[in-house]
Amino acid sequence: LVTGEISSDDDNLIINGYSLELINSQEFNKIELLNGAVITTPRTSSPTQSVIELIASEFLIDATSKIDVSGKGLSFDPQNEQYDGASHGGKGGITLWFADNKPAVTHGSITYPSSYGYGAQIPAYGGPTYGGGAIKISAGIFTLEGKIIADGDQPYASNKGGSAAGGTILIDVNKLRSETGNFIISASGGNGVDVAGGGGGGRVAIYYNEFEHIDISRIQTFGGLAGNFDRAGHGEAGTIYL
């Protein structure tokens, strides 16, 4: 899905102020996201679906642009108890409404993740939430001023449901740089509502030879907050591998 116009040829992909949904992996000499550009992916239907990869010698995301695969992961995990947050890199928070509830187990690789976040069940309150999707970036020089996000959904306030887990962000580059240092890389769990738990954090792994102006505190796999702190638990943080 392309909203507006983009510039692409065999060598370069320049997205200027528009949104692009990728259905498969792409390779260019140069990729640039400028002036509010967004790259996303379709929602996955299978935990074994291949991760979409973007490959470029030079890759730039400016301060107004982002790659966003939030909520593009899986629907609810059959292991998940009702009202509990979903698990991925970290365990989802459990509701205290049901004394016997236990969080679903974590899944995926810490060092080279390719797994999707799961969503949580919302029985009697509508459909499930959806976990964060998965994206891989391979580049020679990757300049990141904007955002890469693979967060889990949180339910609408009326749903009273558990939240989804964060997804996966895998970056494999020669040089990762930022002129401003104001970027965000996030694969965090969504926040719960009412008696429900927060989603577990996802997984981020970054392989690099050089860092330039990279503040690692801006790389996040937070667990989601419980809906009501007295009646549910927070999601656990996910994993970050550098």
Residue ranges and their predicted role:
Residues 208:
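Active-site-proximal C-terminal subdomain of hydrolase catalytic domains
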Residues 1-17, 22-23:
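Boundary/junction segments of secreted and surface-exposed precursor proteins
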Residues 60, 211-212:
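Transmembrane beta-barrel strand/turn architecture of Gram-negative outer membrane proteins
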Residues 30, 34-35, 40-42, 46-178, ...:
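Glycine-centric low-complexity/flexibility signal
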Residues 218-220:
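Active-site and glycan-interaction determinants of carbohydrate-active enzymes
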Residues 18-26, 46, 53:
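N-terminal extracellular ligand-recognition/capping segment immediately after the signal peptide
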Residues 199, 212-215:
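Strand-loop-strand
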